[in-house]
């Protein structure tokens, strides 16, 4: 049995210490969670009433998609949001500014720090909506859970203490280190059909597998919900994905989204909700649907959602939420226009049809999640591109693929190989998604199968997927190497800090099979392996179970969440000498006039993700300390002029790191901007990618296009995101050019009405005028004028 370290609740002295429990304690009944589940029912009567009001505003004959129903039923004022600037409600998608009231908020430990620091400055006694904190991002994967978890707890004690004390004070449920990955825990405990929630992580849409509208946001957006302020979203367009047929053989739900990512690309879903429908939906498990929704983030989608389906009822029942299942089933049976399915005749802005019966496994990568290749073509692709043919490691798990179904299908392959006397030729790592999953896999001997085969079972946490991987296989920085993972993201350097590690994304089944071959060119559907006795061995297609026949094991009671009851007597302390946490100083408001004398700090070439702008991995420890983490700003960005990474030049031609030059200019009172290409800020929801440039003196980012979450985060922190009216103008502006704005101040003052230009002065003295576009709403103009959304909230609170 894999023994899990358990979080010891903070004592009066506020000390946090790990301890091990006996097997008897490990499987104790989880009374707290079972009782708490009764309070996790979505406010269905209110949501249904709100939808009825929406029908009155838009007309009862208006056919709505599922996503529209759930979103519009959570509007603060349906008439205001749906009829303002929309041709009396005829042109809502892409035009209306929806002001929404989410049902709940979830935060992971890395992003929760800044979200809580912002929330604390508002001076409220508790959160306005139910909220939870999940400690999953700051746990390193190296040798296994028993070793890694205590070391990570000790190394992050100050941060975990801060998060737990803040949770206790403000009535937030606190899931301690080792309890599981945020999205798996949300699926098991909080997600429900028809729910709308925000999460401070880009893969929050995972909850769409249970019919929820769940949207990834930055911490400042989460604060809106926590203080009961309406949260604003540009009304998304709807991309319908019709599923037909049934998966078979080696194909899995992961292959649906890997295939879709190849069709849409990393920005093809921007501004859309992906809404799955069709007869194929009823053939998928709840956790399989969650996998599809999880990776909607990789195509830029606002979120993804599935309609209520037969698999949701047994999943809710198995996770102690039979009362939610019953209520949702009653709504689903209430008529053809019910909350939990699209209306007949609902129209989609785009429609893609996928035949599950003909879908085969896909492999996506390297370096981008949309480079999709069918498994049957992958070996040739490897050879044509001269990618490494030796597989260094196979890693399964993560929030995308750590369900009971995922793990038992992988176990089936392990058992087949073990019976033939085979062992993995590549390092093999397994990450359970939650304590409930881990305990169940332990009880059912699945973890024993992995361990006996030579696999390493990591803690119930993000680990290598978020860059918390301490590799011990001797791969040097800068050395080309290949890994296969069942993760969701594969940007350069993301997993191990080595930008030459090629991470190929696949299903857990394909990753497991390739780990046994040790080769990136192996195709388990057709190829064979040699057994120790010299015989040919071929894998059979994997089999698994959606849900455990004996029910889920309860797991360790010490890894259940604290009760969400506020306690004003709890003191939340942030030491002024801390290297990990720092209280926030308000940003200065926008000047009374145009911005002038800005300088171009950097012109970015190619892909610029949030990992590029604010790296994770070892930098996660500074997430609560803005001055310290700002030292990693844009360190992954490629210089458009020289091709160098993290190399910037000042006016005199002197060489600096990007954050060093930004800090020097800040000290000299020089404000700056960044010039970038398409989909700037793709990837995670981390608001540090907006906070850090703002802290260092950044005022504007001008790009060919933006990723949705990052564009919003910039506005929230007072940074102005602008796009080139003509993308060719990217080539006309260079590092160290001087820039003045024309029309920006007037646009901000008028609530977003007006046109903006950049007046560029080249080093030669030549002057250029570059027209730019914006997406600023009236409220967002208020954020920027005030200096940040938090400044505006504080100002309103004191009025």
Swiss-Prot record:
EC annotation from Swiss-Prot or TrEMBL = 4.2.1.-
The induction annotation reads: Constitutively expressed on glucose medium and on ethanol.
Top-tier EC class: lyase
Q: Give compartment(s).
A: Mitochondrion
Q: Where does substrate bind?
A: 108, 201-203, 489, 494, 685-686
Residues bound to [4Fe-4S] cluster are: 399, 462, 465
Q: Which GO terms describe its biological process?
A: tricarboxylic acid cycle
Return the transit peptide range from the UniProt record.
1-32
| Coiled coil stretches, renumbered | none
Q: Where is this region: Disordered?
A: 538-564
Major localization listed first in the record, in broad terms = mitochondrion
| Record-linked SUPFAM superfamilies | Aconitase iron-sulfur domain, LeuD/IlvD-like
GO terms assigned for molecular function: 4 iron, 4 sulfur cluster binding; aconitate hydratase activity; metal ion binding
GO CC, any one term:
cytosol
Among InterPro entries, the record links this protein to: Acnase/IPM_dHydase_lsu_aba_1/3, Acoase/IPM_deHydtase_lsu_aba, Aconitase/3IPM_dehydase_swvl, Aconitase/IPM_isomerase, Aconitase_4Fe-4S_BS, Aconitase_4Fe-4S_dom, Aconitase_dom2, Aconitase_mito-like
**Keyword set, alphabetical order:** 4Fe-4S, Iron, Iron-sulfur, Lyase, Metal-binding, Mitochondrion, Transit peptide
What further note is attached to this protein's record?
Answer: The fermenting yeast S.cerevisiae has 2 aconitases, ACO1 essential for the citric acid cycle, and ACO2 specifically and exclusively contributing to lysine biosynthesis. In contrast, in respiring filamentous fungi the ACO2 homologs (acoB) seem enzymatically inactive and the ACO1 homolog (acoA) is solely responsible for these functions.
Q: What does this protein do?
A: Has no detectable activity towards cis-acontiate or cis-homoaconitate.
Q: Which PANTHER family match?
A: ACONITATE HYDRATASE B, HOMOCITRATE DEHYDRATASE, MITOCHONDRIAL
Which NCBIfam families does the UniProt record give?
aconitase_mito, PRK07229.1
Protein name, please? Putative aconitate hydratase, mitochondrial
Q: Which gene encodes it?
A: acoB
């Amino acid at each position: 049995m894999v023994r899990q370290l358990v979080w010891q609740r903070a004592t009066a002295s506020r000390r946090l210490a790990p301890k091990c429990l006996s097997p008897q304690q490990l499987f104790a009944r989880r009374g707290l969670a079972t009782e708490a589940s009764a309070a996790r029912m979505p406010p269905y009567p209110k949501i249904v009433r709100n939808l009825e009001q929406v029908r009155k505003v838009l007309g009862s004959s208006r056919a709505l998609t599922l996503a529209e129903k759930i979103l519009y039923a959570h509007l603060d004022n349906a008439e205001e949001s749906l009829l303002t600037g929309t041709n009396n409600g005829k042109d809502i998608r892409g035009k209306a500014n929806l002001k929404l009231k989410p049902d709940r908020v979830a935060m992971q430990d890395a992003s929760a720090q800044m979200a809580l620091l912002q929330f604390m400055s508002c001076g409220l006694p508790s959160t306005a909506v139910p909220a939870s904190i999940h400690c999953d991002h700051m746990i390193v994967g190296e040798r296994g859970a028993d070793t890694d978890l205590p070391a990570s707890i000790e190394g992050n004690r100050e941060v975990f203490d801060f998060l737990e004390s803040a949770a206790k004070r403000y009535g937030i449920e606190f899931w301690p280190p080792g309890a599981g990955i945020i999205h798996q825990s949300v699926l098991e405990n909080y997600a429900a059909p028809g729910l709308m929630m925000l999460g401070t992580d880009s893969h929050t849409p995972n909850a769409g597998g249970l019919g929820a509208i769940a949207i990834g946001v930055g911490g400042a957006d989460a604060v809106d919900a926590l203080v009961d302020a309406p949260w604003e979203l540009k009304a998304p367009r709807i991309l319908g994905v019709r599923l037909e047929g049934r998966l078979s053989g080696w194909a899995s739900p992961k292959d649906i989204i890997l295939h879709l990512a190849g069709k849409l690309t990393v920005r093809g879903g921007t501004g859309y909700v992906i809404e799955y429908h069709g007869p194929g939906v009823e053939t998928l498990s709840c956790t399989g649907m969650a996998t599809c929704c999880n990776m909607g983030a990789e195509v830029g989608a606002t979120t993804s959602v599935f309609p209520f389906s037969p698999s949701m009822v047994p999943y809710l029942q198995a996770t102690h939420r039979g009362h939610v299942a019953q209520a949702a089933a009653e709504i689903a049976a209430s008529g053809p226009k019910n909350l939990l399915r699209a209306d007949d005749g609902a129209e989609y802005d785009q429609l893609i049809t996928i035949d599950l019966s003909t879908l085969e496994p896909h492999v996506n990568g390297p370096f981008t999640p949309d480079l999709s290749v069918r498994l049957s073509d992958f070996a040739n692709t490897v050879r044509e591109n001269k990618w490494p043919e030796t597989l260094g490691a196979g890693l399964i798990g993560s929030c995308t693929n750590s369900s009971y179904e995922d793990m038992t299908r992988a176990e089936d392959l392990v058992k087949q190989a073990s019976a033939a006397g085979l062992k993995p030729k590549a390092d093999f790592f397994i990450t359970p998604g939650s304590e409930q999953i881990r305990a169940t896999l332990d009880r059912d001997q699945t973890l024993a199968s992995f361990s006996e085969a030579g696999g390493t079972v990591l803690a119930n946490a993000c680990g290598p997927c978020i860059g918390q991987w301490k590799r011990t296989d001797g791969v040097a920085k800068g050395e080309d190497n290949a890994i296969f993972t069942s993760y969701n993201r594969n940007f350069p350097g993301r997993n191990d800090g080595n930008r030459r590690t090629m991470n190929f994304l696949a299903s857990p089944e394909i990753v497991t099979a390739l780990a046994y071959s040790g080769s990136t060119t192996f195709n388990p559907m057709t190829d064979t392996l040699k057994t120790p006795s010299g015989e040919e061995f071929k894998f059979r297609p994997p089999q698994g179970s959606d849900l455990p026949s004996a029910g889920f094991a309860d797991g360790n009671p010490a890894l259940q969440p604290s009760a969400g009851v506020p306690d004003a007597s709890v003191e939340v302390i942030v030491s002024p000498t801390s290297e990990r946490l720092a209280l926030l100083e308000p940003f200065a408001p926008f000047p009374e006039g145009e911005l002038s004398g800005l300088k171009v700090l950097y012109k970015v070439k190619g892909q610029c993700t949030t990992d590029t702008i604010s790296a994770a991995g070892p930098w996660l420890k500074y997430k609560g300390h803005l001055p310290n983490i700002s030292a990693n700003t844009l360190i992954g960005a490629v210089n458009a002029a020289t091709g160098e990474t993290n190399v910037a030049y000042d006016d005199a031609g002197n060489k600096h790191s990007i954050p060093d030059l930004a800090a020097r200019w800040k000290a000299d009172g020089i404000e700056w901007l960044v010039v970038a290409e398409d989909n700037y800020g793709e990837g995670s929801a981390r608001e540090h990618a907006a906070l850090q440039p703002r802290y260092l003196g950044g005022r504007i980012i001008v790009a060919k296009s933006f990723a949705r979450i990052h564009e919003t985060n910039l506005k929230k922190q007072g940074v102005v995101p602008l796009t080139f009216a003509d993308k060719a103008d990217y080539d006309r502006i260079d590092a160290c050019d001087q820039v003045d704005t024309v029309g920006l101040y007037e646009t901000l003052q008028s609530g977003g009405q007006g046109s903006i230009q950049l007046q560029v002065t080249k080093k030669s003295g030549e002057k250029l005028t570059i027209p730019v576009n914006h997406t600023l709403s009236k409220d967002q103009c208020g954020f920027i004028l005030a200096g940040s959304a938090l400044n505006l909230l504080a100002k309103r609170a004191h009025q």
